[in-house]
């Protein structure tokens, strides 16, 4: 049996957990509700903050985690994923794009995003960078259930 565990601040990780729960017919729990000594395999869904996956370190039964789904704004980047995989000691890592609701951010997070946005405005000019900057500045949603397809395929073949 598998349980989906998520850490969510703005709602994207929770939405992906609920979509995955329906597709796998598996329960999903917020990170604070995982019982000690859980016997199920765990699929963890958390959001990216730099190279960290928020909430992953809070799982006390880390040996039960069979895969991690990382939620972020940027397009998939293999080099960044390799860094995240290494820094978080995750073998089976998947990536999906999420949403940003600026109302859910703390002051420090808004400040940091403002700095990143200015840097992107000055140095990054690709259409993808402009899309991410727009979502960072105004909020927006890049999530879709079909982004879970690579994970679902992997899960069915393991």
Give a label for each model feature.
Residues 1-62, 149, 153-158:
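N-terminal beta1-alpha1-beta2 submodule of the flavodoxin-like/Rossmannoid cofactor-binding fold
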Residues 112-158:
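Glycine-rich phosphate/pyrophosphate-binding loop and the adjoining helix
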Residues 1, 36, 70, 125-128, ...:
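Residue-level signal for well-ordered alpha-helical segments
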Residues 32-108:
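Helix-loop-strand module that forms the ligand-binding subsite of alpha/beta enzymes
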């Amino acid at each position: 049996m598998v349980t989906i565990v998520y850490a969510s601040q703005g709602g994207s990780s929770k939405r992906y957990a609920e979509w995955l729960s329906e597709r796998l017919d598996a329960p999903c729990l917020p990170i604070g509700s995982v019982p000690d000594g859980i016997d199920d395999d765990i699929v963890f869904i958390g959001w990216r903050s730099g190279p960290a996956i928020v909430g992953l370190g809070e799982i006390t039964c880390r040996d039960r985690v069979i895969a991690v789904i990382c939620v972020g704004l940027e397009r998939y980047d293999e080099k960044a994923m390799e860094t995240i995989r290494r820094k978080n000691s995750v073998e089976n890592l998947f990536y999906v794009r999420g949403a940003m609701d600026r109302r859910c951010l703390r002051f420090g997070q808004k400040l940091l995003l403002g700095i990143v946005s200015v840097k992107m405005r000055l140095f990054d000019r690709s259409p993808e960078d402009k899309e991410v900057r727009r979502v960072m500045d105004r909020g927006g949603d890049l999530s879709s259930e079909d982004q879970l397809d690579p994970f679902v395929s992997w899960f069915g073949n393991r």
